[in-house]
Amino acid sequence: MSRLPSSRALLPTATALVAFVSSAAAQPAPIGFQSPSKNIACQLFSIDNRDWLRCDIVEMATTPKRPADCDLDWGHAFEISARGENAARICYGDTVIDPALPVLGYGDIWQRKGLTCTSDQAGVTCFNADRHGFSLSRGKQDLF
């Protein structure tokens, strides 16, 4: 007849499982937003004590040619730091598109850590404290 393990034998496994579930649940929610059309999504990241905003656009009228030094995807991702950096189109292998992000309604403003974004029917515009940024829409993507 088979015996079930004692509760003492199960305790280490149960403790490890609770610790794993607790650490997974402790992950912070993404900080960002998506446009009402869900064509554009942006998320804030802190890397090496610097704050960065990354925005991805799903559909564009045209896709720019990928540079030779980019082995990943090109054209749909943009980033800007909170200070001192120009905005850039980036080479990427992932996405910040997340249907769980809150919607930034038309006419609304999103501000975090020196970064500001506005949403209107034409698209999304984001800039930093130095007024460097980008405007994204299906029709065109401008860096400034």
Question: What label would you give each PLM region?
Answer:
Residues 118, 125-144:
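Extracellular glycan/ECM-engagement signal in secreted proteins
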Residues 54-104, 136-144:
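A low-complexity, Ser/Thr/Gly/Pro-enriched, surface-exposed linker/loop concept
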Residues 2-13:
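Bacterial N-terminal signal peptides that target proteins for export
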Residues 93-127:
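Acidic, glycine-rich flexible loop segments
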Residues 22-27:
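Sec/Tat signal peptide C-region and signal peptidase I cleavage site
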Residues 12-21:
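Bacterial N-terminal signal peptides
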Residues 28-39, 106-112, 116:
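Extracellular glycan-recognition/adhesion modules and their associated mucin-like linkers
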Residues 29-70:
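N-terminal secretory signal peptides
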